[in-house]
């Protein structure tokens, strides 16, 4: 998926998350493309992607509509992902981090450090973060010697906003979003540290907490302002 395609997916996801498109609303390629100022092709791809994420469902032969879901549904789905990813992290820590997995995780940790080190975000950073975040989570999930957890996460990812890469980053307030990604990067580094040290319980706890950033961050930021 190109950066332009990812941007369209992210913008649509944000509009749904903010309630600009309400459950039951029908979405057409032409209307959405005109609203976003893009061609129909990335919109068509975005519809398919968001259908897989559980945000849209088919309505008729060619149309899509926003799926019905509640905040309780979102919270439960994200919490389930945290439990499953925490289980994977604990298993990986207790098994011992293989050198090749250590190297892969270190690479993406350094990518995140470099992105955060400059002290601000630009719009192109959003796709970079999405890529490194997906790799970090994916490596942990697929390195435990069993596909059971990965399969369970894949099924859960079909629920609205459940997937690790469905986090909403507001490109209209990058200063605020920088703080969220700064915290997420700190979590990544702590998780990596616990994996290297073989601290299974700590890795599990950190991974479960990390999954909740998207839900709890607005509340935490409001308390600090």
Place the predicted regions along the sequence by residue.
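Short linear motifs at protein or domain termini
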Residues: 1-95, 148, 220-225
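A generic short alpha-helical patch detector that favors 3-5-residue windows
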Residues: 4, 76, 80, 100, ...
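Solvent-exposed, amphipathic alpha-helical segments
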Residues: 11, 15, 83, 87, ...
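Short, flexible helix-adjacent loops and helix caps
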Residues: 17-21, 89, 93-97, 117-121, ...
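Short, flexible turn/loop "capping" segments at secondary-structure junctions
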Residues: 58-59, 133, 183-185
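A ubiquitous short alpha-helical element
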Residues: 71-75, 93-99, 120-125, 171-180
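Conserved amphipathic alpha-helical segments that form helical-bundle/coiled-coil interaction surfaces
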Residues: 99-168, 187-190, 202-213
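C-terminal all-alpha effector/ligand-binding and dimerization domain
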Residues: 165-225
